[in-house]
From Swiss-Prot:
InterPro entries, sorted: Peripla_BP_I, SBP_2_dom
Protein name in the entry: D-apiose import binding protein
Gene3D superfamilies cross-referenced by the UniProt entry: 3.40.50.2300
Organism: Paraburkholderia graminis (strain ATCC 700544 / DSM 17151 / LMG 18924 / NCIMB 13744 / C4D1M)
Coiled-coil parts of chain: none
Signal peptide as annotated in the record: 1-26
Amino acid sequence: MKASKRWVALAAATLTLFTATGTAQAANLIAIITPSHDNPFFKAEADTANARAKALGYDTIVLVHDDDANKQSNLVDTAIARGAKAIILDNAGSEASISAVRKAKAAGIPSFLIDREINATGIAVSQIVSNNYQGAQLGGRAFVKALGEKGNYVELVGREADINAGIRSKGYHDVIDQFPNMKMVERQSANWSQTEAYRVMETILQSHPDVKGVIAGNDTMAMGASAALKAAKRSDVIVVGFDGSNDVRDAIMRNDIRATVLQPAALAATEAVEQADKYMKTGSTGKPEKQLINCSLITKANAGKLDMFALR
């Protein structure tokens, strides 16, 4: 009888401990949702957010939506079911993601967006993004200068549903189009993909062998274009990217790529977590919903200081 009572007491204590632990985890859980970590930019922001959240004492779940809005919606459901108290989100489309962020808000979970805005305000608590237009103008000026203000060039743009693709393209053209001897002979999407950019660049070289430059909407496309140019023995073609990845840093040091634009992924991710922490503790971030972080130009002169999307 005494043994039976001991087992009952032990079971009750175990259940109490499990319940308390589960409650504590839910009270301290931050969900971090980004596109695929195959792109080093998204991996860097997820890793940075994860590390900062843990340093502040939070548990985390790190999830990947692969730029699929339906999958993103399911992951938000997962965050809700797990009792997350905040979501750090690099979203899967400026329009398609509105419903997911609204769903999180309806469940009482604040969202803190990084890298990509949504086409709505008042739903997310914060939208912390790189100043893509300002950064693209930096890249555009470097590109024009490298080509001596003249020559046929190609633009590789990102995924159409991503608002950043259009903003960067506009920033580039608002600079480049001021120079009448700069002629764009081809503009194609490579959907942020290195593999796709390689294939696109191979085809473009066949129809436009006189191309002098390639300006890309991100670094993975710049790397794909650079690889295609290298295979074609076209080391004379100037390539400029956008992101600030370690791969492009190394390519700049090898003279394979001329420049890139650093968008500070680590800084935005850190800011998002710290603002989430403050919001959960005080009910306010103390900052406006929409926040822009300026970008920096990376060339051979400062590439050695670049590491994991930050100048060290």
